[in-house]
Amino acid sequence: MAFLSLHTSPMEQPGAGDAGGMNVYVRALAMALAESGVEVEIFTRSTKAGQPAVEHPGPGVCVHNVMAGPRRKLPKEELPELLHHMVEEIDRIRLQQLHGRYDAIHSHYWVSGVAGLELSELWGVPLVHTMHTMAKVKNLVLESGERPEPRRREEGEQRIVDGAARLVANTPAEADELVSHYGADLDRIDVAPPGVDLKVFTPSFRRKSRSLRGVRPDSFHILFAGRIQRLKGPQVFVKAAGILRKRRPDIDLEMTILGSLSGAKDFNLQHFIEDAGLADVVTHRPPVVAPELASWFRSADVVVMPSFSESFGLVALEAQACGTPVVATNVGGLSRAISDGRTGILVDGHHPSDWADALEDLYDDVQTREDMGRLAATHAESFGWQRTAAITLESYREAVSGLLVPRR
């Protein structure tokens, strides 16, 4: 299999820049497929001087760092100009391989999908595509003053939907969005829920994790992990915590934010923190590797995901696997990742007072919080990556047997 993840590398640290759940998804899926006997070669754009041409994250998986454009990170909006160059370089790399061919292509995100259409036609092999996010869906939830996703992206995604042999969606809701917004054929969509690394994200003693992470033993610890951008909604959680603190000064509040700024540079989270009167209780840290992230999840009383749009929300699944309840927006894949009222709370909308209510309810009811944590860990056990790989592999087989290449 040839994987295309051109705008971001699966070797990048999630939570930094454009790296997020998709990076985890691409790498974990590739590793799980390799365990099933599928050789996976991932193509991504080289973004730093001295980067090796090939990296090996695990047996049966390699990552090709493709030379195209300057060896530095570029805004996603500039990458379409490099697509033809990347296609040429990927084909050159293919010709250097002993096997010289791939059975199919699996592209991730629209930039890779557009390149995938060209490579699919060039190689005579089918294209399987996963959107991860969709322009038309994101444009429905824009906040005032936010720049919409460009028409070029919408048109590119439409071409991908029309030309791919199969589409892999994270949830039934995402499949419905592909049909309603892009006119996708439901018979060509396979739903493969993402997984979680159940060897890393496991429950453990909260007090021990708090000691490791320097969290006070008896504080009410709220955690946000993700890219710092409006779409992920950290400003909603900060405003809600500010309301909660004014409402309940008796609560020993402690807040941790793990992640770095992504996208628009004018988004100033520190301004929201200071405006809410929370500067003395918020600790902002850079993103961390998976084992450390799991320890942070275990140290929290609740993990928050106030996203405006999520195709799935891997953070929610990882937190639950650690035995921590999640409060999240009732949107996209989060409504599937979380069992409302059992493993966490789904909040309709983004009104800070509604979020403050949810957090206050969990603070006041320790027993419910603990019960949710236990149920959350059990719930997450059904989301292993091998299940994702099995469904995705069947999608590849359907694509190859149909021998569908891009239709013009």
Swiss-Prot record:
Q: Where does Mg(2+) bind?
A: F297, R298, A300, T324
Q: Which residues bind 1D-myo-inositol 3-phosphate?
A: H7, D18, A19, G20, G21, M22, N23, K76, Y109, T133, R153
**Class in the EC hierarchy, top level:** transferase
- Disulfide bridge positions per record: none
Q: Which reaction does it catalyse?
A: 1D-myo-inositol 3-phosphate + UDP-N-acetyl-alpha-D-glucosamine = 1D-myo-inositol 2-acetamido-2-deoxy-alpha-D-glucopyranoside 3-phosphate + UDP + H(+)
InterPro entries per the UniProt record, alphabetical: Glyco_trans_1, Glyco_trans_4-like_N, Glycosyltransferase_grp1, Mycothiol_biosynthesis_MshA
**Cell division found in the keyword field:** no
Is the keyword Protease in the record? no
Query: Which keywords accompany this UniProt record?
Result: Glycosyltransferase, Magnesium, Metal-binding, Transferase
**Molecular function GO terms recorded:** acetylglucosaminyltransferase activity; D-inositol-3-phosphate glycosyltransferase activity; magnesium ion binding
Could you say which EC number(s) this protein's record lists?
2.4.1.250
Q: Name the residues that bind UDP-N-acetyl-alpha-D-glucosamine.
A: Q13, P14, G21, R227, K232, V288, E310, E318
What's the domain of life for this entry?
Answer: Bacteria
Similarity comment: family membership: Belongs to the glycosyltransferase group 1 family. MshA subfamily.
Role: Catalyzes the transfer of a N-acetyl-glucosamine moiety to 1D-myo-inositol 3-phosphate to produce 1D-myo-inositol 2-acetamido-2-deoxy-glucopyranoside 3-phosphate in the mycothiol biosynthesis pathway.
Q: How does it assemble?
A: Homodimer.
Q: Which HAMAP family does the UniProt record give?
A: MshA (MF_01695)
**The protein's name:** D-inositol 3-phosphate glycosyltransferase
Quote the gene name from the UniProt entry.
mshA
